[in-house]
Amino acid sequence: NSSLASKNYDYDYDSIQPYFYVDNEDEDFYHQQPGQLQPPAPSEDIWKKFELLPTPPLSPSRPSLSSIFPSTADQLEMVTEFLGDDVVNQSFICDADYSQTFLKSIIIQDCMWSGFSATAKLEKVVSERLASLQTARKDSAVGDNAECPTRLNANYLQDPNTSASECIGPNTSASECIGPSVVFPYPITETPKPSKVAPPTDLALDTPPNSGSSSSSGSDSEDDDEEEDDEDEEEIDVVTVEKRQAVKRCDPSTSETRHHSPLVLKRCHVSTHQHNYAAHPSTRHEQPAVKRLRLENSSSRVLKQISSNRKCSSPRTSDTEDYDKRRTHNVLERQRRNELKLSFFALRDEIPDVANNEKAAKVVILKKATECIYSMQTDEQRLVNLKEQLRRKSEHLKQKLAQLQNSCLSSKRH
């Protein structure tokens, strides 16, 4: 048991760290313990005690089909070792002595290090144990002897997040166990509650959470989460909240699992024409009649499209219909305001007094336009009168010219 405990204690990172206190408080802290490294001296920097370990490597991926279904020679060899040697059985079974040693270890009592580096290491060990246990169970099914599988501990096959119940042997009482809430008060990742334990034939298909590969039942939800993360980086025009229906998936076994996804943000785009009223107008000429007809046609198309969508789609609630009406009204109102603004700009450019004043108010533009119209009408009347006077003068001169020509001809005859 001591050799087994020392061998399995390798994944406890505290055994190789010189920055932790010794379990026995009566011993001298600065006294070098046998089998441990030299603790830091008082002159060293105190902050070195709180340095975090580098990021641990990722957990191994799911075992391949070759490891799940070994060859016939490998099956016979593993069956003989599994049935003949008791030491091999102890690699799959955690007895009471080792469980007590594991519960007394610093990695369980220290919540900080249990939440960081040791979790990935424990998950790696659990995934390896699951793969080896699956192979051993299939090999034991080949031989008709069912004596040793009765000692297998089913508690070890549960979720690795239930830290204390991973390696509790069948002889360990419930009072010696440590609750997950005591060891890990703050969970690292939010994982769904584990369902009932599946039959032993399906154990190799499930991998521990936070591992490098995902199970087949949760692949769709993880892909959806990745797509949502990509969409969050883009600009969302309108966000609506929808609740997904429960998706039913049938596993290769007879068990059926139902997955409920939380509220999901769905992206919707509203085709509205936005205009920056503070920007400088690009053109100062009034729009021709052709462009106005195009705008009217586009607005009528919007109305027809919305009405056709209402007819084709399923019956909506009154709130959705009101929202469509408001959206259509806003689009048409925005177009009307744009046309009115362009008309004021064109009128301002025709008035000499405010032609160069880009910040002229609409009231000033209208007043100056009225004054300009009155002055233009006065000038027009004056010019009309002048034209009439000039016409009369030209007729009088023509008559005088005709009289002079007649007098000249009469003088030549005499």
UniProtKB/Swiss-Prot annotation:
Its main location: nucleus. Signal peptide: none annotated. Residues 240-259 have a biased composition (Basic and acidic residues). Residues 383-404 are annotated as: Leucine-zipper. It is found in: Nucleus. The keyword Transport does not apply. A motif (9aaTAD) lies at residues 77-85. One of its GO terms (cellular component) is nucleus. SUPFAM superfamilies: HLH, helix-loop-helix DNA-binding domain (SSF47459). Keywords: Activator, DNA-binding, Nucleus, Transcription, Transcription regulation. Residues 192-263, 296-330 are annotated as: Disordered. GO terms for molecular function: DNA binding; DNA-binding transcription factor activity, RNA polymerase II-specific; protein dimerization activity. Residues 324-376 form the bHLH domain. SMART domains: HLH (SM00353). It comes from the Eukaryota. Residues 220-237 have a biased composition (Acidic residues). InterPro entries: bHLH_dom, HLH_DNA-bd_sf, Myc-LZ, Myc_transcription_factors, Tscrpt_reg_Myc, Tscrpt_reg_Myc_N. It holds the Pfam family Myc_N. Residues 296-317 have a biased composition (Polar residues). Efficient DNA binding requires dimerization with another bHLH protein. Binds DNA as a heterodimer with MAX. The 9aaTAD motif is a transactivation domain present in a large number of yeast and animal transcription factors. Transcription factor that binds DNA in a non-specific manner, yet also specifically recognizes the core sequence 5'-CAC[GA]TG-3'. Activates the transcription of growth-related genes. This is Transcriptional regulator Myc.
